[in-house]
């Protein structure tokens, strides 16, 4: 059986350079149908590996800047706020909190230009990270790569922060990790802020190994976009959710919000403000030898990181979390 490649035609020959580059890059990078290949599984793995290579050649700034993303962000509306400028001569790990149900704020702020990231932080190329399994799905994989999204695997993070950039070693690059992950989504209740963070220190060790400064990010309103069934009131549901998490790496919160033509039941998020505040960077001293990274230094940076999150909360809670029913809480 012969192998067929389906390439995108150059239909934008009269358009902007960015438009044509985006199409030709996707064509050259293997926008193919795996089922028509002699070795579909091998091809699928090789295409998925592009998400961990640290190579941003599939990133399409034209797609990231489409007007549809501005419409998407204005639905809530979502806004991005900067505590202070970031130097393009450093590299960064942005830690996004909370996860919420779907992390709408993380997508709007760091996977698109709808909120003006490039204007707020000129010279910094930020890559939003997600589960590696998302890059094993044909078509969706190409879409994610074009949006500048990459795998959250350790290999991917290290490659992104140690290759390319201004100096060929990651200068001017950043990654955004939703630190709380699937576990935190189960605590995504309106008007609360419960962060799964006490034991999450892998990203701190990654920062030390790569020499990337830590940048805490707090999204006010992320947990307010959906209502969720409280799993602690339903032990069977909670056990099932945790089983799915351990098996598949993600969980399935039971949630609802509004519909297209009603405000009571549906899967569309509520129209509630999203204010994403980027905190002050925490300087990290690089230690290339992973085995020699000191636990005391990891704990010290983790403590500074939590303190910066708490500072953001205290500074902005009366403006962006007026309807809160509790204060910020950091749990294991």
Identify the role of each PLM range:
Residues 181-184, 306, 310, 332:
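Structured cytosolic regulatory/catalytic domains appended to multi-pass membrane proteins
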Residues 67-282, 288-292:
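Soluble catalytic domains of membrane acyltransferases
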Residues 274-277, 294-313:
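Pol beta-like nucleotidyltransferase catalytic core
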Residues 318-332:
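C-terminal helix/juxtamembrane-tail motif
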Residues 285, 308, 312-319:
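Hydrophobic alpha-helical segments
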